[in-house]
Swiss-Prot record:
One of its GO terms (cellular component) is cytosol. This is Thymidylate synthase. NCBIfam families: PRK01827.1-3, thym_sym. Its main location: cytoplasm. GO terms for molecular function: thymidylate synthase activity. The keyword Hydrolase does not apply. Pathway: Pyrimidine metabolism; dTTP biosynthesis. The active site is at residue 179. DUMP binds at residues 25, 159-160, 200-203, 211, 241-243. It is found in: Cytoplasm. It comes from Cereibacter sphaeroides (strain ATCC 17023 / DSM 158 / JCM 6121 / CCUG 31486 / LMG 2827 / NBRC 12203 / NCIMB 8253 / ATH 2.4.1.) (Rhodobacter sphaeroides). One of its GO terms (biological process) is methylation. InterPro entries: Thymidate_synth/dCMP_Mease, Thymidate_synth/dCMP_Mease_dom, Thymidate_synth/dCMP_Mease_sf, Thymidylate_synthase, Thymidylate_synthase_AS. Its EC number is 2.1.1.45.
C-alpha cells in the first residue's frame, strides 16, 4: 500500500511536469494546476505532518488556535514566536511609511508598542473574524464555529455543517483574501468525523503542508468537542501552484522517501473549543528529513 504522503509528492511532480506557467499577483510567477484532491485517514491517530521535509507543526497549530480566538492582529502570534503572517503588514508599513525597516525590527516594535501594533499589526477582517464574528446585514455577529459544533452534537446527519471565510463585503479589507476558504464536516453512522477543506489558492511547497496540519488539528479538536472520533481529512485545491523560485526545492523533496507518519493526540479534554492551548497537543514519532528553505511570495 502506498504511503499517504506519496499523494502530495505526486502532486508536486505533476505540477513540475505539467503545470501551466503563469504570471501571478506577486510577480514571481508560478507553475499551476487547477483542481487537485488528497485524502488522509486520521482514524488511526496518524496525521499528515510531512516527513519528506521538516514541518514546524507547532507553528501551524498555534496559527489555528489564533484563528479560533477570532484574532486579526499579528501581535499575539509574535508573542508565540509565530512569524508567518508578518510579511503582509510589514510590506504595508514599508509602502505607506517609506521606512526600510527590517522584519525583525518591525516585529519587535509590534511586540513592544501596543499603539504601533494596533495600527500596523492589523490584518483586517481575516479568517478568525469571519469564523467567529461574521457580521450580518442586521448587525448581528455569527459564530460559525460554535454553530458547527452545536449542529454536530444535535443533528450530525446534517449536510449543512460547514464554515467559510469568503465574506464578499469584506474581502477587499483583508491583508490577504482567504486561501483555505471552506471547511465542511460529515459524520458517519459509526461516529467518525470526516472533514473536507477547499483551498482556492495553494502555495504547494510552503502553504499546503501547514494547511494539512492546521486542518488535522482542528478536526481533532472539533471531534473531541462533539463526542466523535476523527475520520478522513479530504483536501481539495483550486489553483494549485509552485512558485518559480520554489522549483529546485520541490525537485529535492520529490526525491526523498516518506517515513512513517507521526501521531497527534490531545492531552486533555478542553471545556470548549476556545480553551485549547498548544500544550494540549502531543506529536509522537516524528522523524522527518531536514527542512527545505524557501522564500514566501507576498
Amino acid at each position: 500500500m502506498a504511503h499517504p504522503e506519496q499523494q502530495y509528492l505526486d502532486l508536486l511532480a505533476q505540477t513540475l511536469e505539467r503545470g501551466d506557467r503563469r504570471v501571478d499577483r506577486t510577480g514571481v510567477g508560478t507553475l499551476s494546476l487547477f483542481g487537485a484532491m488528497l485524502r488522509f485517514d486520521l482514524s488511526g491517530g496518524q496525521v499528515p505532518i510531512l516527513t519528506t521535509k521538516r514541518v514546524y507543526w507547532k507553528t501551524a497549530v498555534k496559527e489555528m488556535l489564533w484563528f479560533l480566538t477570532g484574532g486579526t492582529n499579528i501581535r499575539p502570534l509574535l508573542q508565540e514566536n509565530v512569524r508567518i503572517w508578518s510579511d503582509w503588514p510589514l510590506a504595508a508599513y514599508r509602502r505607506e511609511s517609506g521606512e526600510e525597516i527590517s522584519q525583525a525590527a518591525f516585529e519587535q516594535r509590534v511586540l513592544e508598542d501596543e499603539a504601533f501594533a494596533a495600527r500596523w499589526g492589523e490584518l483586517g477582517p481575516v479568517y478568525g473574524k469571519q469564523w467567529r464574528r461574521w457580521l450580518g446585514p442586521d448587525g448581528h455577529e455569527h459564530d460559525q464555529i460554535a454553530a458547527l459544533i452545536e449542529t454536530l452534537r444535535t443533528n450530525p446527519s446534517s449536510r449543512r455543517m460547514l464554515f467559510h471565510a469568503w465574506n464578499v463585503a469584506e474581502v477587499g479589507q483583508m491583508a490577504l483574501p482567504p486561501c483555505h476558504m471552506v471547511y465542511q464536516y460529515h459524520v458517519t453512522s459509526d461516529g467518525r468525523l470526516n472533514a473536507l477543506l477547499y483551498q482556492r489558492s495553494v502555495d504547494l511547497l510552503l502553504g499546503a503542508p501547514f494547511n494539512f496540519v492546521g486542518a488535522a488539528a482542528l478536526q481533532l479538536m472539533i471531534a473531541q468537542q462533539a463526542g466523535l472520533v476523527p475520520g478522513d481529512l479530504v483536501w481539495v485545491g483550486g489553483d494549485t501552484h509552485l512558485y518559480l523560485n520554489h522549483l529546485d526545492q520541490a525537485r529535492e523533496q520529490t526525491g526523498r522517501a516518506p517515513r512513517d507518519w507521526p501521531r497527534m493526540r490531545l492531552l486533555r479534554r478542553a471545556d470548549s473549543i476556545d480553551d485549547y492551548r498548544i500544550e494540549d497537543f502531543a506529536v509522537e514519532g516524528y522523524d522527518p528529513h531536514p527542512a527545505i528553505a524557501a522564500e514566501v511570495a507576498v
